[in-house]
């Protein structure tokens, strides 16, 4: 019965009831099935023995026989199975298993096989044969690999059974999976089995999800299994595998711990522990024990399972990164396999290990054995070539290498083939780096393609071949610069890409990470190098070379010499042989040089030159790096130190000796270029040019010297003419397409595209099929603003080269030119020709067409069509991800979703945008754009509780992300967490001093905290970075706010007024602040209850002027949407008068805004202050007090802070006038709690103590106020001097008076009333 019939509602199978659940049997069978499928046959037998020792279970006993057969224990299997051939319930299964065992014997007993086949036929035709017998036979045939026969047997079993059995559904699922049937129907079979709590059904679900690369769903399914089925180890193993797929290495270790197995008891668990240890933990001290535990576990559980030993060996070698210790341990595993069976594949694997360890003799021996064996493994086929290259027999190796692909075409798909090709390219006559680079690129690309279809897991890691990748990296060492260069060249980029590939898979391989640090250091990216070194030491702090590189970095970055010394000593402690290397002495000399101990530096360098040169290895796979080429760097450093000490003659002699020593060797060319680079780093530009000019045509480094000279002329001397002349000289000597192209690149670099076009066209004539050259011509036309020519060129090139990238470039250009119709036509054309693209690369290109089409449709205001384009792009992307979901594909899926979400965000369709962002995060959980967009949306929707999580995710990935840090700081600000907010805003300003939003918040927070100097430093720093920032509205609002806090209202008004004509935002803030100052100049209330009752002409006129000016500013705001803040300002202006009717009208409006319908709750603190102010002006003080008390207990926040402060100050003022000073102090202290710099609070406090004649306490308050205003406010100066006088602090009084008069000569009142009296008192 096919699985398709399970979907049929009329299927008789569906009308049957489910059979009995035998939980213990199910668990045992599921365990055995799992281990047998995974190749752990010995472990499966132990599970069988454990159950069979306590209970009779014929079906399980048959499975034991199957496992014995799979393990190659044929006699044991036959003896065991013969006892069950008469058991009617399992006879068919026993007979099939017995037939398989006999057929697997070294000398099969054909007579016995015929007899068994006869018995099978008889029983199969017998109607009385029970369904269990057929079901058991189906199991046996499944494990024998006869899936079609297995299915036939299972169909009969299901028909004969009177009940439905979960075991049957599950087995059918595994058979269909093996036959490659539709996975949807197969998944339904597993789900039906799993629904009946049959463990292997859930394992099947995990297998399908693994094939779909659906790690999160697989982890959920495995987790359900681990929880629901107690002590079912495969559930924990599958969960660990899902964690590996997600690269959640900590989760892997959690699964191992939760499995709760004694160390070394289960080989599968130990494999996972070992993979975690090598790929992630990287703890060298623990790794030896971990590998020993794995070997012990295999010896105890799988002693005769040579296939498993070999499989684990291959896994270890593949993830070793060619680490010597791991390879030696791997050899121990392979030795077990080879003792049992000397299969050709095992010998080839042995060859791979020997090659990795650099054992030329062993490789030679194994090569001779492999030649005699029939083995298609690339290590076997290429073994003799490898052997020859390891002893420098280049010509013999090349001759054999050239003919091998014709006999073995599959070699061209082998990464090892391209590694050998790269070595031979280095040994060719022209020593072309381009050829070498191409072979390494092919190696990386070939490996990447082979891995693409595999989910990230144990099979992926077995194929990964980090040992080969690291060998490829080592080959690049010979092209490394001797001293750091300004920007990475092709070699450094290639190496970094390869190393990054290793790091992405196995960050625990510290020696590979160290090479990333070294790469960054040589590319002058010291920040990245430092971070990589930290990661290296985090994994393996015993790596001496990491400490040495750290010392070098510290010195180059101008760090503490003691730190560099410490790093050197630490490195030396871990590897004392470092004293015998030139590098150690080179770095040691630099520490002496930093201390100006130049004689010691020279002595150390000379000592390094006396170290005997190591004999270069004949092994061409070993880089010359290991032969200590740092000697050249030592010679260059010695020359530089001697020159620094004016010992010119000695320096020249050293240079001559160095050139003579390396004469005729490739190092000689490197020496000259490195010397020029060294001069350049010291700022000696002319010396560098002088050395490079000496290199003449015909010398191997002529090409490189002229490119270096061009770089110096452009970047150091800003001489475009000489920059071009260097390339012209190159062209004169080498008139190749490459030289013409280089000259074109040079003119593009100096913004002269017309000249570039001429040279590019010349190169294209010589190399007409070069698509990259054609692209460069198109780019040059665009740079030259020759758009119609660019369009025509792209159109013709698109038709000539049939290149999809040309179509993209044409469409992009048409989009920029706003030629939407033609752009749409160009992008739609491929879909009209081929609506259903096939192949990963083609589909990816079509996705780019759709994304560009979406942009085009959005610009045409055809948003529905743009959304349709995005959906098509996602649909195409899902077709690729069904096959494989690599990290790059995940990021691409997230990018598509992000572009769609950004479109929705721009249209303020937030709900849909959030949904699409979540789709992006399903692809890539830590995607920066998606998380950042979610944060922005939640911020705009005022959903602050949702802002934090996506924002923190961004910061974890990118700690210096400006936008995320700004949103996070705002989150803390809104939550009134001042300390957190200050720290976050300060971090932003350290990165960008002109981050006006952060600066405005910092001014607010610091001034409230009494740290005006700190606030002013940030303002001054912004001005230092960009003196023109004084014209920017953001700066002026921040400065105005600072001046307001420090009591200079006129200065504040001056800064605010500069923003009146700027764009909304800062302008709006400034206008509100200006209105506030107009109504409350110098922090003094002009209109009070007395002026309303008895209006004086001067007060009425002054109030009228202020009101008019405030109205003017309000009118400027009138075009903005009416908000609560606008209404507050409007009514405060209306109240700023002596007209009682106007005051009452404003009061009524404030009453409407301040409370809810039943007046039980405050809805607007600003309006409450307005109500209270109105009551005070109308001499209804008690009513004012009652209203103000309603804000008591309100949680303080920055939004309400100004008006809460005003309410508390008004209450304090009322209590002071009523002589209730204790109550007044309560509210003044409340003000100081949130604004320890409040001038009005200082004033009221001082006034209150004056009334009590406590002049010492009064002057302390006035002192704080006067200091807060930078001693510029004459009012506070007067009050301070007066209280000094009353407290008999006469000299302080006179000094204060003098300060006031120095700044305000027009303030004679202080001299007459206070200063003169103080002087008179001193005289008496």
UniProtKB/Swiss-Prot annotation:
Entry comment describing in which tissues the protein is expressed: Expressed in ciliated sensory neurons in the head and tail.
Disruption phenotype: Shorter cilia with an irregular morphology resulting in functional defects characterized by defective movement, dauer formation, and mating behavior. Double knockout with intraflagellar transport protein ift-43 results in defective cilium morphology and function.
GO biological process, one term: protein localization to cilium
Pfam families: ARM_TT21, ARM_TT21_2nd, ARM_TT21_4th, ARM_TT21_5th, ARM_TT21_C, ARM_TT21_N, TPR_7
Keywords per UniProt: Cell projection, Cilium biogenesis/degradation, Cytoplasm, Cytoskeleton, Repeat, TPR repeat
GO terms for cellular component: cilium; cytoplasm; cytoskeleton; dendrite; intraciliary transport particle A
Keyword Cytoplasm carried by entry: yes
Record carries keyword Repeat: yes
InterPro entries given in the database record: ARM_TT21_2nd (IPR056832), ARM_TT21_4th (IPR056836), ARM_TT21_5th (IPR056835), ARM_TT21_C (IPR056834), ARM_TT21_N (IPR056833), TPR-like_helical_dom_sf (IPR011990), TPR_rpt (IPR019734), TTC21A/TTC21B (IPR040364)
Matching SMART domains: TPR
Positions annotated as TPR repeat: 58-91, 414-446, 582-615, 669-702, 737-770, 772-804, 806-837, 847-880, 894-927, 929-961, 963-995, 997-1029, 1033-1066, 1205-1238, 1240-1272, 1274-1307
Self-association state and partner proteins as the record states: Component of the IFT complex A (IFT-A) composed of at least che-11, daf-10, dyf-2, ift-139, ift-43 and ifta-1.
Family designation: Belongs to the TTC21 family.
Protein name per UniProt: Tetratricopeptide repeat protein 21 homolog
């Amino acid at each position: 019965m096919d699985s398709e019939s399970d979907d049929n509602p009329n299927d008789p199978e569906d009308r049957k009831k489910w059979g009995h659940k035998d939980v213990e049997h199910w668990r045992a069978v599921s365990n055995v099935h799992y281990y047998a499928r995974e190749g752990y046959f010995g472990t499966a037998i132990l599970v069988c023995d454990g159950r069979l020792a306590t209970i009779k279970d014929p079906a399980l006993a048959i499975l034991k026989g199957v496992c014995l057969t799979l393990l190659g224990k044929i006699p044991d299997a036959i003896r065991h199975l013969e006892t069950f051939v008469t058991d009617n319930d399992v006879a068919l299964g026993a007979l099939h298993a017995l037939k398989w065992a006999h057929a697997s014997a070294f000398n099969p007993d054909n007579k016995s096989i015929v007899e068994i086949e006869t018995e099978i036929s008889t029983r199969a035709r017998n109607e009385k044969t029970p369904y269990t017998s057929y079901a058991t036979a189906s199991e046996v045939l499944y494990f024998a690999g006869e899936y079609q026969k297995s299915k036939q047997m299972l169909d009969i079993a299901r028909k004969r059974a009177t009940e439905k059995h979960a075991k049957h559904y599950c087995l059918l699922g595994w058979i269909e999976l093996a036959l490659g049937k539709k996975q949807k129907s197969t998944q339904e079979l597993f789900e039906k089995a799993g629904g009946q709590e049959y463990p292997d059904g859930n394992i099947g679900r995990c297998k399908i999800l693994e094939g779909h690369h659906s790690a999160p769903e697989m982890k959920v399914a495995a987790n359900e299994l681990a929880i629901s089925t107690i002590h079912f180890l495969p559930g924990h193993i599958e969960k660990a595998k899902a964690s590996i797929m997600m690269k959640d290495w900590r989760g892997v270790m959690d699964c191992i711990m939760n499995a709760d197995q004694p160390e070394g008891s289960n080989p599968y668990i130990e494999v996972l522990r070992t993979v975690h240890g090598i790929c992630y933990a990287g703890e060298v001290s623990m790794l030896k024990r971990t590998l020993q535990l794995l070997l012990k576990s295999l010896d105890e559980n799988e002693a005769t399972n040579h296939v498993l030993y070999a499989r684990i060996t291959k896994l270890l070698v593949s993830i070793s990164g060619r680490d010597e210790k791991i390879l030696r341990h791997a050899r121990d595993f392979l030795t077990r396999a080879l003792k049992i069976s000397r299969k050709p594949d095992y010998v080839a694997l042995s060859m791979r290990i020997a090659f990795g360890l650099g054992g030329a003799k062993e490789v030679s021996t194994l090569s001779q054995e492999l030649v005699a064996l029939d083995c298609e493994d690339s290590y076997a086929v290429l073994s003799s070539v490898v052997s020859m290259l390891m002893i420098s027999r280049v010509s013999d190796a090349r001759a054999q290498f050239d003919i091998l692909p014709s006999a073995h075409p599959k070699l061209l798909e082998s990464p090892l083939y391209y590694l050998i090709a790269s070595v031979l390219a280095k040994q060719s006559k022209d020593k072309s780096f381009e050829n070498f680079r191409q072979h390494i690129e092919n190696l990386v690309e070939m490996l990447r393609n082979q891995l693409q279809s595999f989910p990230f897991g144990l099979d992926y890691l077995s194929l990964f071949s980090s040992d080969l990748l690291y060998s490829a990296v080592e080959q690049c060492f010979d092209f490394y610069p001797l001293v750091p260069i300004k920007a990475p060249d092709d070699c450094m980029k290639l190496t970094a890409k390869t190393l990054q590939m290793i790091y992405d898979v196995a960050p625990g391989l510290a020696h590979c990470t160290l090479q990333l640090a070294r790469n960054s250091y040589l590319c002058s990216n010291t920040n990245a190098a430092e971070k990589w070194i930290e990661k290296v030491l985090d994994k393996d702090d015993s790596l001496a070379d990491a400490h040495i590189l750290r010392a070098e970095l510290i010195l180059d970055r101008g760090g503490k010499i003691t730190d560099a010394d410490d790093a050197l000593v630490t490195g030396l402690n871990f590897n004392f042989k470092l004293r015998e290397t030139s590098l150690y002495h080179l770095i040691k000399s630099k520490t002496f040089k930093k201390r100006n101990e130049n004689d010691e530096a020279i002595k150390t360098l000379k000592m390094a030159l006396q170290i005997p040169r190591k004999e270069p290895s004949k092994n061409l796979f070993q880089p010359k790096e290991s032969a200590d080429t740092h000697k050249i760097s030592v010679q260059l450093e010695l020359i530089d130190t001697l020159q620094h000490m004016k010992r010119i003659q000695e320096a020249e002699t050293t240079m001559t000796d160095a050139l003579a020593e390396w004469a005729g060797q490739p190092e000689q060319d490197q020496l000259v270029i490195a010397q020029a680079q060294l001069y350049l780093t010291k700022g000696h530009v002319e010396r560098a040019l002088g050395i490079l000019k000496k290199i003449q045509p015909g010398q191997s480094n002529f090409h490189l010297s002229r490119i270096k000279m061009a770089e110096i002329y452009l970047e150091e001397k800003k001489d475009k003419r000489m920059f071009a002349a260097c390339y012209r000289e190159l062209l004169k000597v080498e008139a190749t397409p490459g030289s013409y192209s280089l000259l074109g690149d040079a003119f593009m670099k100096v913004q002269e595209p017309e000249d570039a076009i001429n040279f590019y066209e010349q190169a294209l004539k010589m190399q007409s099929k070069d698509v990259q050259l054609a692209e460069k011509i198109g780019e040059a036309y665009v740079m030259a603003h020759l758009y119609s020519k660019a369009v025509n060129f792209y159109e013709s090139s698109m038709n000539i080269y049939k290149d999809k990238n040309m179509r993209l470039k044409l469409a992009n250009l048409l989009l920029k030119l706003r030629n939407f119709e033609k752009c749409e036509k160009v992008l739609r054309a491929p879909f009209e020709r081929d609506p259903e693209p096939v192949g990963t690369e083609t589909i990816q290109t079509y996705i780019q067409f759709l994304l560009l089409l979406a942009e085009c449709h959005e610009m045409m205001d055809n948003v529905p069509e743009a959304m349709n384009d995005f959906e098509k792009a996602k649909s195409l992307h899902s077709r690729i991800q069904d096959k494989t979901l690599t990290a790059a594909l995940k990021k691409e899926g997230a990018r598509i979703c992000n572009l769609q979400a950004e479109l929705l965000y721009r249209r303020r369709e937030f709900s849909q945008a959030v949904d699409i962002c979540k789709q992006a995060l399903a692809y890539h959980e830590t995607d920066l754009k998606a998380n950042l967009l979610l944060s922005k949306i939640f911020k705009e929707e005022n959903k602050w509780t949702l802002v934090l999580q996506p924002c923190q995710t961004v910061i974890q990935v990118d700690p210096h992300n400006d936008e995320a840090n700004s949103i996070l700081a705002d989150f803390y600000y809104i939550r009134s967490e001042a300390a957190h907010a200050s720290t976050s805003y300060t971090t932003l300003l350290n990165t960008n001093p002109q981050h006006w939003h952060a600066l405005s918040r910092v001014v607010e927070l610091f001034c409230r905290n009494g740290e005006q100097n700190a606030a002013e430093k940030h303002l001054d720093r912004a001005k230092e970075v960009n003196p023109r920032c004084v014209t920017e509205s953001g700066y002026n609002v921040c400065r105005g706010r600072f001046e307001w806090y420090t009591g200079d209202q006129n200065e504040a008004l001056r800064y605010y007024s500069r923003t009146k004509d700027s764009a909304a935002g800062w302008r709006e803030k400034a206008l509100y602040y200006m209105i506030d100052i107009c109504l409350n100049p110098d922090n003094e209330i002009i209109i009070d209850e007395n002026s309303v009752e008895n209006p004086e002409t001067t007060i009425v006129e002054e109030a009228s002027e202020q009101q008019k000016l405030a109205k003017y500013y309000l009118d400027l705001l009138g075009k903005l949407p009416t908000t609560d803040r606008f209404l507050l300002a409007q009514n405060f202006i209306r109240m700023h008068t002596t007209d009682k009717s106007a005051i009452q009208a404003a009061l009524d409006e404030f009453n409407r805004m301040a409370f809810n319908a039943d007046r039980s709750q405050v809805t607007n603190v600003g309006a409450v202050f307005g109500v209270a102010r109105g009551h005070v002006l109308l001499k209804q003080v008690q009513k004012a007090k009652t209203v103000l008390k309603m804000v008591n207990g309100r949680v303080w926040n920055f939004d309400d802070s100004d008006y809460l402060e005003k309410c508390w100050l008004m209450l304090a003022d009322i209590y002071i006038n009523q002589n209730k000073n204790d109550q007044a102090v309560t509210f003044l202290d409340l003000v100081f709690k949130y604004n320890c710099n409040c001038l009005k609070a200082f004033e009221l406090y001082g006034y209150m103590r004056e009334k009590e004649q406590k002049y010492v306490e009064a002057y302390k308050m006035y002192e704080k106020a006067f200091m807060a205003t930078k001693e510029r406010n004459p009012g506070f100066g007067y009050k301070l001097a007066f209280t000094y006088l009353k407290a008999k602090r006469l000299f302080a009084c006179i000094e204060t008076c003098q300060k006031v008069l120095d700044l305000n000569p027009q303030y004679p009142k202080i001299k007459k009333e206070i200063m003169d009296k103080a002087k008179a008192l001193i005289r008496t």
